[in-house]
């Protein structure tokens, strides 16, 4: 984007009617990137005008008319300017990429576009002029620019579109890239648990009364941990001399340290987990600056560290990457109440550092192929970041080996233009891309783009990065008509092939809708399981024909093939009286899938959707066995044990030899559930029993949790609060426990869970306004060393109002 203007006036005619008197001189001692700049200028001018300007390699300036590429020490690494020097055109820039970007920006000015790796637009011109009525010093809006889609990694595409990210295949010939080492989530690369934990558990998180490394973090107030982290970063600097930024960042889960020192620092920093983290990162950065003042230390403001600390400030050599992982992606952040909490954090971080980076999210990570209408948000929020002083953007999209994320090429190109110039007209850029790539089919494809975004503009149409959105009941038929029109308008097989690829998201959405499970009589399954499998195989063949290897983060197509093959229709066992109907699917983890309140005519359990990971084995009410409060549940194989009028018994064989039992019955207006964990083995096993349900909160914006604590304190508050994330969780124990009854009220629906205090050690509440609204209540037994023949028990009672 332009930075500085000084008046000049010159019109240089480089080519007229296919002829030119100009040659290109890359300078006396050009860098590899400046040699590439000369070659790219020569190639593209020839393609536009049929005039081939000679590239002259010379130690001193040749005679005659020249396009001179000049390295200027006084210009920044990516800054450049164009100017006239007599009859010469001078493209001057800093190193390593200034001159190269000066050439690409000039070609862009002449109408050259590099839309995708395969599609370039080169205008045909009989005359090529440069009108220099002013000298313009130019450079990018952000120092770090990375659209993180597989399609954006290509070296030529990335260089020509002036991005410089870590994952892009840029090398010395393109002026390199902004390289991290490692990229993120580096705590266990700094101090590998397999190396240190056995001898030094004090290096790792203190959680629930003991040191842990599984799904934990580092003890950030331990001075030896700081010393070892400094040594490791110095080793990285030696091993990766091309890297500029070194990541000292939390693991990708919770598990922060709860030791007295770390908690004391949290309290000093306003109760924020970011306090111990930033003090630790600053301590590492201070030592690194002494030996390597040109290197930067990076960390995250992410998840539990997203809120800024009260006192500590990032050092000048520290980059904070703020991650808006919980926001709505369909609306501009400044206009959406679901994103207000992030804007509060962004403003706060931007007040305490001028080195702020953003880790933005641009896809549905659970479903790379799902339509993801976020262009309104992008158009507003990339300029918004710039206004708030952000200096770098990582825009995380779909990144599997074979690419293929929804609108990946369009999104990458538009974002690259915004990252260079925040004043880019996104709407015009979308139209230009569609016309450039799809030609005569652009009009119906633009109509599809508008159809998709019209629904997203409605105030209640929130878009999240893991959930299945509501596209509206008529979206699929309208979309199919527009794609049919696009195919009819296409003039060649190559265009039709591109359109077919762009239609994959609509086909995938249809597949997910066909996967939806419902109760039909005494069965729980999709409407047509055989047809669903056939439809999946058809889509799978198309995906593979396009080289697409994955449609979910972390899972390949082989996983999906096994997943669809394993789908089944399940028997349903029901309990019913005048007040309630309870539907249970024993083979789905012994799960109660529906608790129907006949008076309210509502399911007291939350709705599930076919886009959820693990579907249909999700949601409902069930029981689990764990090693402790932090461990994941052990797998269990559930079966129906007994069903008779008014009572059902289920049994679950736990993978470690323990046994779960669930006894369900109706008593008036209550569902009574007794969950039992038994040890039939000959050895003691440390374990905890958990039981609970995913409840329907009604209107999530009105939903409240209400209970009286064991110490007598009354708790009654909304789940969704202004300037707070639209999701959350809380845990109570001791005198903070509910006194045997707690309730979720949500406008037209109310559900209570009753329990015995003598059986419960902890109670947990979690909630979300993302996707299918949910409020989950969980009860935990004490962690107990279960001897042979011993058991744990949790009894619950559920009722509506």
Residue spans for each PLM region:
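Acidic-aromatic substrate-binding/catalytic surfaces of carbohydrate-active enzymes
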Residues: 35, 572-647
